[in-house]
Amino acid sequence: MIFKVFYQKDNTRSPRRETTEALYLDLDVATKEEGVILARELLAKNTAYHVEFIDSLSDESVEYEKETGVFEITSF
């Protein structure tokens, strides 16, 4: 299941929409809830990012992201 994570690189400042970035994680989980938990654990362990929101992507959403933006799976 692929998840899109919205985050701020600087966790010492209040989040601002203009500086929100995104990354994509491909996680082997059974449910969306398990994926959100695992994603938060991975990000806490490997980054100092301020995570704003994590959402699972449908196959259609993944195709859209590939066509319109920079789609690259992040691995830790």
UniProtKB/Swiss-Prot annotation:
Its EC number is 2.7.7.6. GO terms for cellular component: DNA-directed RNA polymerase complex. Coiled coil: none annotated. InterPro entries: RpoY. GO terms for molecular function: DNA binding; DNA-directed RNA polymerase activity. One of its GO terms (biological process) is DNA-templated transcription. It catalyses: RNA(n) + a ribonucleoside 5'-triphosphate = RNA(n+1) + diphosphate. The keyword Transferase applies. Keywords: DNA-directed RNA polymerase, Nucleotidyltransferase, Transcription, Transferase. Pfam families: RpoY. A non-essential component of RNA polymerase (RNAP). Belongs to the RNA polymerase subunit epsilon family. RNAP is composed of a core of 2 alpha, a beta and a beta' subunit. The core is associated with a delta subunit, and at least one of epsilon or omega. When a sigma factor is associated with the core the holoenzyme is formed, which can initiate transcription. This is DNA-directed RNA polymerase subunit epsilon. The lineage of its organism: Bacteria, Bacillati, Bacillota, Bacilli, Lactobacillales.
